[in-house]
Regions:
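Hydrophobic alpha-helical and helix-loop surface patches within well-folded domains
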Residues: 1-146, 151
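Short amphipathic, basic-aromatic surface patches that mediate peripheral association
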Residues: 153-165
Length: 169
């Protein structure tokens, strides 16, 4: 699941550099919403990294490719372009030619950016383990006197396929 999502993310970044980044992102999101969201909402919903599978063909899904790319994009946004590049460079240097796993990739991101490895890996693995599409609610409070807008974001996840909701970072 790591290489599939990472490859799609890199392809999306390349396409954005070649064309209009905004147009490319809008197209990617439209595809995600019309195709992958339907998979997540249906009876075949599964995590980006399923705990088990009946056959390897079950790994060729929009969730693994497209949602996996969105996790890579979140890491890119969280760490910044330079931080993500440092983490990627560390990952390729450390694990070139090996059968690396998601934990190795996340560990590289943490090490290269001076973050607590255990906490970082634990937090980000949640995105790989839980099926379904998170719902984010926004509450805004405008304080006229200080002209300050406070946003409170709340993320919820419904139980899917017998799994319990798990708080996501």
């Amino acid at each position: 699941c790591l290489k599939e999502g990472f490859t799609v993310f890199r392809d999306q970044q390349f396409s954005a550099d070649q064309l209009s980044a905004v147009v490319q992102r809008l197209e990617d999101v439209a595809f995600l919403q019309t195709h992958q969201f339907a998979e997540d909402a249906g009876p075949l919903a599964h995590a980006v990294r399923p705990e088990s599978f009946v056959e390897i063909n079950n790994f060729y899904t929009l969730t693994i490719y497209e949602k996996g790319a969105e996790i890579a994009r979140m890491l890119h946004t969280f760490l910044g372009a330079d931080g993500f590049r440092r983490g990627s460079d560390h990952y390729f240097k450390t694990y070139d030619g090996q059968a690396a796993i998601v934990e190795d990739f996340l560990s590289s991101m943490a090490v290269a950016n001076g973050l607590d490895v255990d906490a970082f890996v634990s937090q980000w693995l949640r995105w790989y383990r839980q099926p379904g599409t998170p719902v984010v609610s926004v509450n805004s409070v405008w304080q006229k006197d200080s002209q300050c807008l406070t946003l409170t974001l709340t993320q919820t996840q419904s139980a899917k396929n017998g799994s319990e909701p798990e708080p996501l970072p």
